[in-house]
Amino acid sequence: MGTFLKVKTPYDNLFRRLVESNVFGWLSVENNKQMVTKYTKWIDIKDIKEHENEKYVVYYLADEKNKQLYIGSAENLGNRVKPGRKEIPEWNKFMYAIVHPQFHENLKEIEYHTIMSFAAFMNNSGNKANLGISDYTLVNKDYKYYRD
């Protein structure tokens, strides 16, 4: 059976964004332990404005020309991710994962775990041992959690 009545409110756009961000999704699943509530596909830099209000994310910036990758985290994506960022000035694609509210306090730890995981597989600016399975280089500078 389809919808037979639809009421428009001034809050339609707000609720649409909340649903798209899966803000309420975790409420409907009892004992949900999922750390990430949403992953995006790779997005072109020209569309950054559409995503700048995303909260509690681990993000990935890719520079396809120079074959570089940068990983970071942000409580607000727009406050951290901007064109021309010094660590990876020519990035042209990005993606991000939204962290479940239950894990917001662990955002930095999740970021560092992600950096260390990528560093183990690809060349990196920290000169950490890796398998070299990509022609991209991880350009993060902070590898304090890396254990040789």
Regions found by a protein language model. Give the residues of each.
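Boundary/linker segments flanking structured domains
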Residues: 1-64, 68-69, 73-148
